[in-house]
C-alpha cells in the first residue's frame, strides 16, 4: 500500500497497475489492492515476462514503467526523472541501474512496448522470462540509456528481499510516521544521523536476488537453515549438479516430482 501511495505522487505515470500472479494465495493481495482502487492484472507465476506482456496488451501503454514490489521506498521524483529521460531520448530502455548510483530499492525501468514485444517473442531462457528485462538489456538489440545520480549511493540497501531488509525499512517508516511520502533525500539524512537503523542489512549484496533463478535462491535459504544445504543427498551437491545448485521440489511421488 505504501509503495502504491508513493507511486501515485508521480507526475509522469498515467496509470498504476499491480501485475501479480494468478496463484490463489495472491487473492488477498488482489482483493486489497482492488479496494484501494488500483488496477490489478493477474498472470503467470514463473513467466513474469509473459505476465507483463499480457498486461500491456490489455492496457495498451506507449511505454511501461517497471517498479518491483521489493521497493517500498521508491521516490516519485526519481521515477519522473527516469521517465523524462526516456521521453527525451530515442532509447528503447532507460533505467537508473545500469550502472546503479542510487540506493538499492529505488530502481526504475522504463521501456517501450515494442521492446517488450520483441523480448516476449525472442527470449527463451527461463532466467530471462523470470526477470522480464534482462533480454532487453543484454541482447545487444536495443538502445539502452541510464540515469546517474551526481553522487554514488549504490552501496546503500533500501530494498526488501530478506528479513533484515524488512527490519531496516520498517524502522525507516516508523521514524517518519505519520508521513509515508517522505523523500529519498530525507532517508539519506536519516542515514547520516541514525546509522544504526541501517546497519542490520549492510552485509547483503546489491541485486543479489535479481541475478539468481528460483532454485539458486532456495539453495541459499537452505544453506542458512540446514547444515550443508541438504539432509538427503548421498554425495556433496557441489560435485555433480550444474552450477553447484541443486533442485528443490514441492512434492514427489514414485518417479514423479513437482518442481518448485
How does the language model describe each region?
Residues 63-67:
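Short aromatic-hydrophobic micro-motifs that form the base-stacking/packing surface
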Residues 111, 131-211:
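Conserved alpha/beta core of the MobA/IspD/sugar-nucleotide pyrophosphorylase nucleotidyltransferase superfamily
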Residues 97-108, 151-152:
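A recurrent flexible, glycine/aromatic-enriched loop bordering the glycosyltransferase active site
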Residues 75-101:
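Conserved donor-nucleotide/metal-binding helix-loop-beta segment in metal-dependent transferases, i.e.
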